[in-house]
């Protein structure tokens, strides 16, 4: 197979591991910076061009698109989909997952338990918004933030009002969420491929920090998840239409709560913690899906 990895930086751990896994399974791989792509959009002969050349068709595309380039990155991914390439995660699902508010609304509609979350526009609603999520302490999140950036713990009502007003002064869209005390700065990252949770780790925030993201100095350990946690992680990924997802879960007294679903989960933390070859599992999943596509096309052609 010919596989394209859409990424701005091919030296990142996840990109290198995916390339190694694909090449070890005898596939050819090209890492493509989506911002260096340009597209010919027409019904007769659509194409993707890259640094002065027209790209040949790829059998599969793996999107590793940063949140800052979601709009253009998913446009490029969509063009590859038009050309018949199999997307590990399709453009619609990636966009869905990147919109934190929309994704939470979709998860809630499917009955998936979440931290109590508020969203408002008018400054006049700040007081009731804080009360609606259970009061302080609470968490204020930028809708467009990633890796723990733009996430603030407000320990008092006055602090919460100040943080919310400051973000609004920047014309930023924010979510206000209850702070789950019993989680104690920990969360569970479930790595979903298809209909399986293939790995799970527990992430612990460093001392003096409440965000458990490994990028912010948190630590990780292998963890055994419950059947309920496994089921909710798979359902969350499926609800957003993702074949591969990192589903972050808080262990609350009332049961597991889905905090976030990541469409481009990093491999370094989970592979080094569990010792599992997640990259190889992802390539194997692509092989299975593309083989089924070929088989289906062959059957249709004969009918």
Curated annotation (Swiss-Prot):
Cellular component terms (Gene Ontology): cytoplasm
Q: Which residues bind ATP?
A: 141, 178-179, 187, 211-213
Name the gene behind this protein.
rimK
**Where does the chain bind Mg(2+) 1?**
248, 260
Q: Which domain of life is it from?
A: Bacteria
Q: Please name the InterPro entries in this protein's record.
A: ATP-grasp, ATP-grasp_RimK-type, ATP_grasp_subdomain_1, RimK, Rimk_N, Rp_bS6_RimK/Lys_biosynth_LsyX
Residues annotated as binding Mg(2+) 2 = 260, 262
- GO MF terms, alphabetically ordered: ATP binding; metal ion binding; ribosomal S6-glutamic acid ligase activity
Alphabetical keyword list: ATP-binding, Ligase, Magnesium, Manganese, Metal-binding, Nucleotide-binding, Protein biosynthesis
Binding locations of Mn(2+) 1: 248, 260
Q: Which residues form a coiled coil?
A: none
The name on file for this protein is: Probable alpha-L-glutamate ligase
Q: Name one Pfam family in it.
A: Rimk_N
Give the protein's cofactors: Mg(2+); Mn(2+)
- PROSITE patterns from the UniProt entry: ATP_GRASP
| Record family assignment | Belongs to the RimK family.
Residue limits of the ATP-grasp domain? 104-287
**Keyword Transcription appears in the UniProt entry:** no
Any one biological process term the GO annotation gives: protein modification process
Cofactor: how bound: Binds 2 magnesium or manganese ions per subunit.
Q: Which cysteines are joined by disulfide bonds?
A: none
Chain positions recorded as Mn(2+) 2 binding sites: 260, 262
């Amino acid at each position: 197979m010919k596989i394209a990895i859409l990424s701005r930086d091919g030296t990142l751990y996840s990109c290198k591991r995916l390339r190694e896994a694909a090449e070890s399974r005898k596939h050819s791989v090209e890492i493509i910076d989506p911002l260096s792509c340009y597209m010919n959009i027409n019904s007769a002969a659509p194409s993707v061009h890259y640094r002065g050349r027209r790209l040949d068709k790829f059998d599969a595309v793996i999107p590793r698109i940063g949140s800052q380039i979601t709009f253009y990155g998913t446009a490029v991914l969509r063009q590859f989909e038009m050309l018949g390439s199999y997307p590990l995660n399709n453009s619609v699902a990636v966009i869905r997952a990147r919109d934190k508010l929309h994704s939470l609304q979709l998860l809630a509609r499917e009955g998936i338990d979440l931290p109590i979350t508020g969203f408002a526009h008018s400054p006049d609603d700040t007081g009731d918004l804080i009360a609606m999520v259970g009061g302080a302490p609470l968490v204020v999140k930028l809708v467009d933030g990633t890796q723990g950036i733009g996430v603030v713990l407000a320990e008092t009502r006055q602090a919460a009002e100040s943080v919310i007003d400051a973000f609004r002064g920047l014309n930023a869209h924010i979510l206000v969420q209850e702070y789950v005390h019993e989680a104690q700065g920990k969360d569970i990252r479930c790595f979903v491929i298809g209909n399986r949770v293939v790995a799970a780790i527990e992430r612990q925030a460093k001392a003096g920090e409440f965000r458990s993201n490994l990028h912010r100095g948190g630590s990780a350990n292998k963890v055994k998840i419950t059947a309920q946690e496994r089921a909710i992680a798979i359902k969350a990924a499926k609800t957003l239409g993702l074949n591969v997802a990192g589903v972050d879960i808080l262990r609350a007294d009332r049961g597991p709560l889905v905090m976030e679903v990541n469409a481009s989960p990093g491999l370094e933390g989970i592979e080094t913690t569990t010792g599992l070859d997640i990259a190889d599992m992802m390539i194997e999943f692509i092989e299975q899906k593309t083989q089924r596509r070929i088989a289906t096309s062959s059957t249709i052609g004969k009918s």
